[in-house]
Amino acid sequence: MVSIFIRTYKRDIAWLDLCLQSIRNNLKGWDEIVVCIPEGQEHHLRYAKDVRIVTSPVFPNDYIGQQVSKLLCHHYIKGDMVLIVDSDLVFLPGASVQDYLENGKPRILTNKWPVPADKLAIKWRPIIGKLFGKEPPCSFMQGHGARLFLKSTLQSFSAHFPDIEAYARKQPRKEFSEFQFLGFFIYLNEPQNYLLLDINEVPMAQYHTQQFWNVDGITKITLDELAQYNLHPQWPNTLSPWDQFRRQLRQVTRRTKQWFNSLSHKNT
């Protein structure tokens, strides 16, 4: 049995609408969809049909909170495998859970740290080493908006790190990565259960997906592209007027900063 687990939040609901449509229209090989949202935001999922809705604890920083939800998703799912999906991912015609398997095993993509180390290696090796007590030989962040894991792996990870939620709450926003941690755990403890592939040594597998995320939300250009796959927004906007105003304010602030940065570059 294969579960799909999607961790969302109130500002991603418009994307989730399209993601769920694409799963039902295009993705083959799954048995259930579990949608997780922070406690207190359940009303934003009132238009979701034929999914199981669960809640996760509220974090001061939900960027870390959503990662912890994925690490602990074995508490919510029924399947013996779980496809963890970003809510802004769209599955295209021909998509199948089999896309994430090779020789019957979930595929884990790796990328060796360069020599000499680049900024990415310098940043992530000690962050991963802080949790594990040793540094990894490669990065495990390679992915396409969806990753397949065995439920037993998540259970084992949780047993090995029973205080991972408390640990996460103490970490800075950009010093926690659920997929770096899971990947290294698999590398150390369960390499026989997965196919670990270095992206520099093998051809890239074909994934029938596209990630449409845009800091400006769902633009007309994005809508036109999605319409080619018969995907159209179906849910009304669930954000409050205040949340909509805050989103617009952030967009204006970001564009203003970009404009000032472009001016400073021209003057240098």
Language-model features: where?
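Conserved donor-nucleotide/metal-binding helix-loop-beta segment in metal-dependent transferases, i.e.
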Residues: 91-124
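The conserved acidic donor/metal-binding loop of glycosyltransferases
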Residues: 86-90
